[in-house]
Amino acid sequence: MAQSTKGAALVLSWQRCGDDSHWCSFLSVNLDDGSLAKGGDYVIWAEDADGSRKETVYVGQGKPVSNCLARHRDEVAITRHQRSGRVLRVTWAEVKKEHRGGVEHFLAQALQPLEGDRWSDDDPIQVNLPW
């Protein structure tokens, strides 16, 4: 598990896809990927096709992350953000169980997702943001 502390922050290894390390497509990322079988925190966002104008759609945590993402693929509140000229992206990081709630809380505060209104009550744990 690639987690270290840098000052007071927890440093996470945010996952990317492909040999060129591009941001993963939320709707087509391979949910059988081994890194998604672990527990962690994740961020779903919408952006223009050229990667500009990122808007965080949802942050969450769970184990396995693949099950969480599969469930979100069926939620119109999330998928509706992929529309003309906009694409949905996802990244995730393996996070120890005892830190997941705090990381989720921090991500929700920092990224202000458009969807979701219930996040962990754990004290926020500062982490490096994906972008």
Feature names for model-found ranges:
Residues 66-89:
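A broadly used, surface-exposed interaction patch
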Residues 113-130:
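Coupling/hinge elements of helicase-like and P-loop NTPase modules
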Residues 1-63, 71, 98-109, 129-131:
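GIY-YIG nuclease catalytic motif and its immediate N-terminal context
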Residues 76-77, 81, 92-94, 124-127:
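Short, intrinsically disordered/low-complexity patches at protein termini
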Residues 86-100:
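Nucleic-acid nuclease catalytic cores
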